A protein has these predicted regions:
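Extracellular/periplasmic helix-exit of transmembrane alpha-helices
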Residues: 67-80, 221-222, 230, 250-279
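Flexible loop linkers connecting adjacent transmembrane helices
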Residues: 4-10, 44-49, 72-97, 122, ...
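Loop-to-transmembrane helix boundary motifs in multi-pass membrane proteins
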Residues: 95-98, 133-136, 247, 291-293, ...
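Juxtamembrane transmembrane-helix boundary signature
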Residues: 32, 59-91, 101-111
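Helix-loop-helix module between adjacent transmembrane segments
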Residues: 66-74, 96-116, 121-151, 206-207, ...
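Hydrophobic alpha-helical segments and their helix-loop junctions in multi-pass secondary transporters
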Residues: 163-190, 205-221, 377-385, 410-418
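A generic transmembrane alpha-helix motif of multi-pass inner-membrane proteins
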Residues: 183, 193-199, 373-379, 392-418
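Transmembrane alpha-helical segments of multi-pass small-molecule transport proteins
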Residues: 102, 127-148, 165-169, 328-347, ...
Length: 418
């Protein structure tokens, strides 16, 4: 096994370090992982588990498989062309089409940032009793400060630490409950759509497969500029990137599954429907003990902060891409995009009447924009003019088109059920 890993992943430049070389290249995918363990996911997953038990675990699995294919394709674009998805959209699509696509993606990113900031604010209210609106301002300000003063590598280190805190928190929570693992295992692979579940299913999909993450992943990858280093380096990096994506998305799948399972074993089993994350934390205490609600709130705070940072970075990537530029926090187009995103997110937080419903519907909004981004991604990565010899194969194109069709069908189900 080790020899196989060395052969497949070993570096041609260094002579190969096998499995150790793999670990050195894990990082960009974890920036994406943060985006799908954000507070919007918490709201969607808690709603799914508390209302339908284990029944909707399958959508977490399906969404993660779709996410792996899409994120690998977005990273593929960045590695092969040296352009992120936003830059490539501006460069290769008609101007009015490119601006419309990026404009819709930017609005979806503001919706994302609103969910992240709102979730962090709810956590501050749980921990310190701060009003939600004041918490929104604090979370947005801290996130923007972290972005304005951090390089990619520093941001990666922050985020890996934050993901670790969230993951360990849910391991601790699951250790306190009795899980029906055979039922959970069956639900991971058995699709079902209980009555009234359409909006929750689409919100879980939107919470996992998020359009802003496709822009972010391609930007982080392309900033390393492998495209000018020759075919050997590009092909090597494609292998490393695939492992990074599989590992990172696997971590996200486990954490999202843990959220649904926790809600199913605590709330659904006791007939409690979660309509507020703060209420969810309070409801954990009598069932699992007082420490459980504190662990829940701390994990939510770290999830909110870290995902706010990546949402802001994605916003800056999109606005820079509108001008065919790379993301650079010290550049005017990037910094204005970041600042405007947080201002818009805070403004949305201030007018949302019900924070929990705001989280749920923000995720549904993301899934409505997602087909647009997926179509553009497929169009670009299947073009030999854009990708050269690294253009999508026919089987990969068929897979990506199938993913786009699933997303569109679920969106239609949501719209007809509203």
């Amino acid at each position: 096994m080790i020899n196989h890993l060395k052969h497949h992943f070993g570096s041609r430049r260094t002579g190969g370090h096998g499995g150790l070389d793999i670990a050195r290249h894990i990082g960009p995918g974890l920036l994406v992982t943060v985006g799908f363990i954000d507070p919007g996911n918490w709201a969607s997953n808690m709603a799914a588990g508390s209302q339908f038990g284990y029944a909707l675990l399958w959508i977490v699995t399906l969404s993660t498989i779709m996410l792996i294919a899409l994120q690998h394709n977005a990273a593929h674009l960045g590695i092969a062309t040296g352009a992120c998805l936003a830059e490539a959209t501006t460069r290769y699509l008609p101007r009015f089409v490119g601006r419309a696509v990026l404009g819709s993606a930017y609005l979806a990113t503001i919706a994302t940032a609103m969910a992240e900031v709102l979730g962090g604010a709810i956590a501050l209210q749980m921990l310190f009793g701060l009003p939600v609106r004041a918490g929104c301002v604090i979370v947005a300000a801290v996130s923007m400060a972290m972005l304005m003063t951090s390089s990619y590598k520093r941001a990666e280190r922050w985020i890996i630490a934050f993901v670790g805190v969230v993951g360990l928190s849910f391991l601790a929570e699951l250790a306190l409950v009795k899980v029906d693992w055979p039922q959970a295992a069956a639900s991971w692979i058995t699709p079902s759509m209980p009555s009234g579940s359409a909006a929750i299913i689409v919100s879980v999909l939107g919470a996992v497969v998020m359009p802003h993450n496709l822009f972010l992943h391609s930007e982080v990858i392309q900033s390393m500029h492998f495209e000018g280093q020759g075919e050997q380096i590009i092909e090597e990096r494609l292998r490393y990137e695939l492992f990074d994506t599989l590992f990172s998305m696997g971590v996200g799948w486990a954490i999202n599954s843990a959220m649904v399972i926790l809600a199913a074993t605590t709330f659904f089993a006791h007939g409690i429907v979660v309509e507020d994350l703060a209420v969810a934390a309070d409801a954990l205490s009598p069932i699992l003990g007082p420490a459980s609600s504190t662990i829940f709130a701390v994990a939510l705070l770290f999830a909110g902060l870290s995902s706010s940072v990546t949402a802001g970075m994605a916003a800056g990537t999109i606005t820079a891409g509108m001008f065919d530029e790379e993301y650079d926090i010290h550049d005017r187009h990037s910094s204005i995009g970041v600042a405007a995103c947080f201002v818009g997110a805070v403004a949305a937080c201030l007018v949302v009447p019900n924070p929990f419903e705001g989280l749920i519907w923000s995720q549904a909004l993301l899934s409505l924009q997602l087909p647009i981004t997926v179509v553009v991604l497929i169009r670009l990565t299947s073009s030999r003019r854009v990708m050269g010899k690294y253009a999508n194969s026919r089987p990969l194109n068929a897979l990506l088109v199938g993913i786009g069709a699933i997303v569109t069908i679920l969106d239609v189900v949501l719209l007809t059920g509203m």
